[in-house]
Amino acid sequence: MSKEVIVESFELDHTIVKAPYVRLIGEETGPKGDIISNYDIRLVQPNEDSIPTAGLHTIEHLLAKLIRTRIDGMIDCSPFGCRTGFHMIMWGRHTSAKIAAVIKDSLKEIAETTTWEDVPGTTIESCGNYKDHSLFSAKEWARLILEQGISDDAFERHVI
């Protein structure tokens, strides 16, 4: 017998969410009581737009560093294949508002002050597709997302 598997993100009605937003997908408790939280960091409206691969790749590398300087406990922040945002996995519990503030502050740094020298992992030794980066695209998308504001609610706009 095969186990029935439900993937939450495929159950989400992508036609009713209002990006940009941060949404707590769920929490899991490990055998020793540790809590892991999974967040939907949706930066662009699903099925209306997507971030080009090179820009998204650069945002990914920058968020890997910038989020960790702003909050403890980040395990991973990986882009969705649809290129509309990221899954972020964290140790512990954090409100969507707290995570949204961290993302907003990180995107602000990308848009305003980041230089090519600030982007980690852009060499052949440190990245599996090191030629596929665009700081210009990352900065432009960060500005567009910040102009719209980041909500801590996926279904009602509550910009932080």
Curated annotation (Swiss-Prot):
Keywords: Autoinducer synthesis, Iron, Lyase, Metal-binding, Quorum sensing
One example GO MF annotation: S-ribosylhomocysteine lyase activity
Keyword Iron among record annotations: yes
GO biological process: quorum sensing
Keyword Protein biosynthesis included in the entry's annotation: no
Broad EC category: lyase
The EC number(s) this enzyme carries: 4.4.1.21
Entry note: cofactor: Binds 1 Fe cation per subunit.
Task performed by this protein: Involved in the synthesis of autoinducer 2 (AI-2) which is secreted by bacteria and is used to communicate both the cell density and the metabolic potential of the environment. The regulation of gene expression in response to changes in cell density is called quorum sensing. Catalyzes the transformation of S-ribosylhomocysteine (RHC) to homocysteine (HC) and 4,5-dihydroxy-2,3-pentadione (DPD).
Subunit structure: Homodimer.
Family: Belongs to the LuxS family.
Annotated protein name in UniProt: S-ribosylhomocysteine lyase
The species this protein was found in: Streptococcus pneumoniae (strain CGSP14)
Gene encoding the protein: luxS
